[in-house]
């Protein structure tokens, strides 16, 4: 892994910082685990735009990722580490002893030909998946389930990790990457280690065109619009627009949007740090 800053041969290269891709060992994905992916362009079934700033982008093929890791006791060998255009982390192709092939989110330190395993009896080593009840306190984890058997829902982006803090009855206290501390059922699974591609946050696109390749469209400022289009629009000259608001009129800075009656609030011990 690592990053490199390109030489300023062109204006688009001047500020560009890209990943090294040194950990990638295969460029052609496993055919049985790849599917076509249709882009919506931010439109719904009726063709109406429901999400702004989405459209275009390079054509992608979807890699089927195993987030459940429920083949307990069956060892798997890491065949390759690959690039996935649909996520910031790298993915690893596993060959199970029974012949099945799956993709998983690759953690930092995972090597080709390394053996990994899932289940209660698995050792707490990088790449292994265990129930939270069997993971030692202080261990760095990722790919955390919220309900047993549901599949990993949290801590899946490049470079992030959570930490097992303590145990409380049927729950395990986990410190999330945001700084939030919350309870998770001890039967839920998590994988050992931090997610790969840690330098992803240091990358810079260098030009607007590379953002378009990713499927993002230009974001027009509200103060540049007319009053009919945005609460911050209008005014003589370059007006400030008043208090920052969203297009729907909600305060854009400092307004809490989480539902106070959300069922999962009871599991949050300490809110995330701002």
Swiss-Prot record:
Which molecular-function annotation in GO is an example for this chain? rRNA binding
Pfam families linked to this entry: Ribosomal_L2, Ribosomal_L2_C
What's an example Gene Ontology biological process for this entry?
Answer: cytoplasmic translation
What are the boundaries of the region Disordered? Answer: 228-254
Keywords in alphabetical order, please. Answer: Ribonucleoprotein, Ribosomal protein, RNA-binding, rRNA-binding
Q: A Gene Ontology CC term for this entry?
A: large ribosomal subunit
Q: SUPFAM superfamilies under this entry?
A: Nucleic acid-binding proteins, Translation proteins SH3-like domain
Gene3D superfamilies named in the record: 2.30.30.30, Nucleic acid-binding proteins, Ribosomal protein L2, domain 3
PROSITE patterns assigned to the protein according to its UniProt record, in alphabetical order: RIBOSOMAL_L2
Q: Where is the composition biased (Basic residues)?
A: 244-254
What family name appears in the similarity comment? Belongs to the universal ribosomal protein uL2 family.
Q: Self-association or partners: how does it assemble? A: Part of the 50S ribosomal subunit. Forms a bridge to the 30S subunit in the 70S ribosome.
What's its job? One of the primary rRNA binding proteins. Required for association of the 30S and 50S subunits to form the 70S ribosome, for tRNA binding and peptide bond formation. It has been suggested to have peptidyltransferase activity; this is somewhat controversial. Makes several contacts with the 16S rRNA in the 70S ribosome.
Give the protein's recorded name: Large ribosomal subunit protein uL2
Organism expressing this protein natively:
Azobacteroides pseudotrichonymphae genomovar. CFP2
């Amino acid at each position: 892994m690592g990053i490199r800053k390109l030489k300023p041969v062109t204006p688009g290269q001047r500020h560009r910082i890209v990943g090294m891709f040194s950990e990638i060992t295969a460029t052609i994905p496993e055919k049985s685990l790849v599917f076509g992916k249709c882009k919506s362009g931010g439109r719904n079934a009726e063709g109406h735009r429901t999400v702004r700033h989405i459209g275009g982008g390079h054509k992608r093929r979807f890699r089927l990722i195993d987030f459940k890791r429920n083949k307990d006791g069956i060892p798997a060998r890491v065949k390759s580490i690959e690039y996935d255009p649909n996520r910031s982390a790298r993915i690893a192709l596993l060959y199970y002893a029974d012949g099945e092939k799956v993709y998983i989110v690759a953690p930092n330190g995972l090597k080709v030909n390394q053996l990994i395993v899932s289940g209660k009896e698995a050792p707490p080593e990088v790449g292994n998946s265990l129930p939270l009840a069997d993971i030692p306190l202080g261990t760095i984890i990722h790919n955390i389930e919220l309900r047993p058997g549901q599949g990993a829902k949290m801590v899946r982006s490049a470079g992030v990790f959570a930490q097992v803090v303590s145990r409380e009855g049927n729950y395990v206290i986990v410190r999330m990457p945001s700084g939030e501390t919350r309870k998770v059922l001890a039967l839920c699974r998590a994988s050992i280690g931090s997610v790969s591609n840690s330098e992803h946050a240091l990358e810079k696109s260098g030009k607007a065109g590379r953002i378009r390749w990713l499927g993002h469209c230009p974001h027009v400022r509200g103060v540049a619009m007319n009053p009919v289009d945005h609460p911050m629009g209008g005014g003589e000259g370059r007006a400030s627009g008043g208090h920052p608001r969203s297009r729907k009129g909600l305060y854009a800075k400092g307004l809490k949007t989480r539902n106070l009656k959300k069922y999962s609030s009871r599991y949050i011990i300490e809110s995330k740090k701002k």
